[in-house]
């Protein structure tokens, strides 16, 4: 323990280029620890960590862990990884990323945001609010925050704002002082097995809050509302519901912004604006308004913070415009996220929407096939490409072709299956001036936007 507290520990990350791992590594580097890491390929993230003083290796090899005190892994790292095997052979502790994150949080008051969707945006907004209020928080986010130029920020204040990952249950390792839950949908059932087990996991997460802490819960979501009787700590709710402690009314969607009136029970807090698309982002902002109010931050400061929020990369990010076509990129890959993003795009821009969607993981495609079948109703044209495996093995029946058939069977009139290598060219043939093109998915479909723009500019 003294080794870690004195910042003499040598910490190695396997898969350091991952969005969850790199943020923790960056904070540790800025705190003065010796940090090394390995990844399969070079990226902007690994180059940034190397520039901060990290020793980065490409490829996984036993020699990478010979001089380290602890090895940090994510759930994506296989048990037979040579660095993990060598560390265990040498009796070097091998810990999940959440355990290292929890160790950092013990030094601060932790604000942890969890939920099936919206947690990256909400975490980023919360960190921005605390920074704007002069609290100088540390933050670890699951996406690159435009204002930080990174997915992490080391602050000198007493607060740490983190995105809590429920996918493998690791969020039960972290100790939040304030816990926010945005929603709970059936997801990651390869780990949780049943929706009820997932729901119980969120109950346990919220109840990790200390007696002096707080839970902030979205009452609009039925599963979140269902955990209220099981919450043992002080809790406030938010949403459009008239039963919410913090309520949003008169939501207005206009271009790249959402505006709404916020109330604390029946007391008006004012009209707020955030430069994000979609009704769901009004609720994400409302969670942050509730956080600020409960922390004693004046509503005027919160209003200014939300108005100046610059967003997160791959959350309805405009990639460019060419030949009268606007190209937008978004990380949404769950049916609820897809539906909300497409609905927000149509409501805000009132243009023809061409969606380029890449399913993410065979398990998700299999488990949520029916939900995906109705998620694309707000896309005039859907170009569906190959499943991004994310390390999974193929599953019989869980194919892009079967998904395309399901979407057509549920009534969509314009669905085309396109190989990933041909996606940009296929899109060029379908778009026309005035269209909004939306690349959607957590895989490499993000590159299809710039590819399309290059073709349109010729």
UniProtKB/Swiss-Prot annotation:
Provide the protein name.
UDP-N-acetylmuramate--L-alanine ligase
Transmembrane spans: none
Which reaction is recorded as catalysed by this protein? UDP-N-acetyl-alpha-D-muramate + L-alanine + ATP = UDP-N-acetyl-alpha-D-muramoyl-L-alanine + ADP + phosphate + H(+)
A single cellular component GO annotation: cytoplasm
Identify the pathway.
Cell wall biogenesis; peptidoglycan biosynthesis
In this chain, ATP is annotated as bound at: 115-121
Q: What class of enzyme is it?
A: ligase
Provide a Gene Ontology MF annotation, just one.
UDP-N-acetylmuramate-L-alanine ligase activity
Keyword Mitochondrion attached = no
Question: Which compartments does it reside in?
Answer: Cytoplasm
Give the Enzyme Commission number: 6.3.2.8
Q: What does this protein do?
A: Cell wall formation.
Any GO BP: peptidoglycan biosynthetic process
Name the family the entry cites: Belongs to the MurCDEF family.
What keywords does the record list, in alphabetical order?
Answer: ATP-binding, Cell cycle, Cell division, Cell shape, Cell wall biogenesis/degradation, Cytoplasm, Ligase, Nucleotide-binding, Peptidoglycan synthesis
